[in-house]
Regions:
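N-terminal, charged/glycine-rich beta-strand/loop interface patches
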Residues: 1-131, 136
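Broad gene-expression machinery/nucleic-acid interaction feature
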Residues: 12-16, 64, 81-83, 113-115, ...
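Intrinsic disorder/low-complexity segments
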Residues: 31-34, 187-203
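Tryptophan-centered short beta-strand motifs
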Residues: 41, 198, 205-207
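Structural motif
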Residues: 93-95, 124-126, 153-155, 235-236, ...
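Internal, conserved structured core segments that host functional sites
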Residues: 107-172, 180-181
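A structural signal for small-residue-enriched, beta-sheet-centric alpha/beta enzyme cores
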Residues: 160-190, 202-309
Length: 309
C-alpha cells in the first residue's frame, strides 16, 4: 500500500434514528405491556452523514415500524468508521434489519470500526441485521451496546463469519475485536415508612451481558475446542425479559448443526451458536426469534420483506 493511499481518509459515516409511539393515557408511568401501543410508531428523527442511510419505513404488521439500514458502498475498508445510534421512545416498537451482509475488506494497515448504540426506554426494539463478513486482512473493531430499562422488551443478534468458506476465501490474516454488551437501568427503591409506597431513589446502569471476542487470522482459538472449534461462523442472540420456560423452548430447536447453547442470565436469554457457515446460524436465530416473539414482544413473527428478495 503506497503512502498516498495510506493517508487517504476513509468514510466517516453516521446514522442517528429516533422512534416515537403514542403511550396509552392510562399508563402514566410509560409501562407499556405487549400489544398495548396506541397509534403507529413513527421515525421522528433521521440524521445521516456519509454513506449510511435508511430506506423509508415499512408497516407490514400495522403499528410496528420496520426499517432497513443500507450502506451504499457495499463494504467497509481500512479507515472507514461507521456509527449507528438508535433511540426507541416509550410506547414505540421498531424492527431494524439490513438487506445484505456487511462486508469488511482488507485494511492494509488501517483498522475499520463499527459502533452501534441501541436504546429502548419503555419500548420494544428488534435488532435483526444480516451477518458481518470479515475477509482476509481485515482489521476491525465492532461494538454493539444495547441499553434497556425494566419496561423495555428486546430481541436482537449479531452474527460474524470469518471469510467466505463456501468460496474458499478464508480469514487467515487480520485482527478482529468484536464486543457485544447489554446494559439495564435498574431503579433502586425504598418504602416510605408512613405508607409503605415504593419510591424511586436512584437509577443505576448495570451490565447484564458483556462479551469480548479477540481473534487474529493465526489465533489458536480458531481451532481449539475451547474456542471456535474450527467453525467459521459465530453468533449471539439476546432476548429480554425472558424466563426459564422460554429457554427450555429454544433448547428444543438445537439439534445437530449449528453447535449451540442457550442460557438465562439475570432475565436475559442468551443463545450462542457456531457453524461452518453463517447461513446455519442465521436460520437458527430466525427460528428462535419466531418462537420468542409472541411471548417477549407480544406479536406473531412477521418476516421483514427484504429477507425475501
Amino acid at each position: 500500500m503506497d503512502a498516498a493511499a495510506r493517508n487517504t481518509p476513509g468514510w466517516q459515516a453516521e446514522l442517528r434514528l429516533r422512534f416515537n409511539g403514542d403511550i396509552p393515557r392510562f399508563l402514566a408511568n410509560g409501562d407499556v405491556p405487549p400489544g398495548e401501543q396506541r397509534g403507529r410508531t413513527r421515525l421522528i428523527e433521521r440524521h445521516h452523514k456519509g454513506p449510511l442511510v435508511v430506506q423509508r419505513p415499512f408497516y407490514p404488521e400495522g403499528d410496528p415500524c420496520h426499517v432497513y439500514l443500507v450502506h451504499p458502498p457495499g463494504g467497509v475498508v481500512g479507515g472507514d468508521e461507521l456509527r449507528i445510534d438508535v433511540q426507541v421512545d416509550a410506547g414505540a416498537h421498531a424492527l431494524i434489519t439490513t438487506p445484505a451482509a456487511t462486508k469488511f475488506y482488507r485494511c492494509e494497515g488501517r483498522h475499520s470500526s463499527q459502533t452501534q448504540e441501541l436504546r429502548a426506554a419503555g419500548a420494544m426494539l428488534e435488532w435483526l441485521p444480516q451477518e458481518n463478513i470479515f475477509y482476509r486482512g481485515a482489521e476491525v473493531r465492532t461494538a454493539t451496546r444495547v441499553h434497556v430499562d425494566p419496561d423495555s422488551r428486546f430481541i436482537g443478534w449479531e452474527i460474524g463469519c470469518l471469510g467466505l468458506p463456501a468460496r474458499r476465501e478464508h480469514f487467515d490474516s487480520g485482527v478482529l475485536r468484536l464486543d457485544l454488551e447489554l446494559w439495564k437501568s435498574l431503579r433502586d427503591t425504598d418504602a416510605v415508612q408512613s405508607s409503605r409506597v415504593p419510591v424511586c431513589l436512584e437509577t443505576r446502569n448495570v451490565p447484564i451481558f458483556l462479551d469480548r471476542l479477540r481473534l487474529t487470522g493465526e489465533s489458536r482459538a480458531r481451532g481449539a475446542v475451547w474456542g471456535l472449534a474450527g467453525q467459521e461462523a459465530v453468533g449471539t442472540l439476546l432476548a429480554t425479559p425472558a424466563t426459564r420456560a422460554q429457554v427450555d423452548s429454544i433448547r428444543e430447536l438445537i439439534t445437530g448443526e449449528p453447535f449451540a447453547a442457550v442460557s438465562l442470565v439475570d432475565g436475559v436469554l442468551v443463545l450462542r451458536a457456531l457453524a461452518p457457515q453463517a447461513e446455519a446460524v442465521r436460520k437458527l436465530f430466525i427460528a428462535a426469534w419466531q418462537r420468542l416473539r409472541p411471548t417477549v414482544i407480544g406479536r406473531e413473527a412477521v418476516l421483514p420483506r427484504i429477507w425475501n428478495t
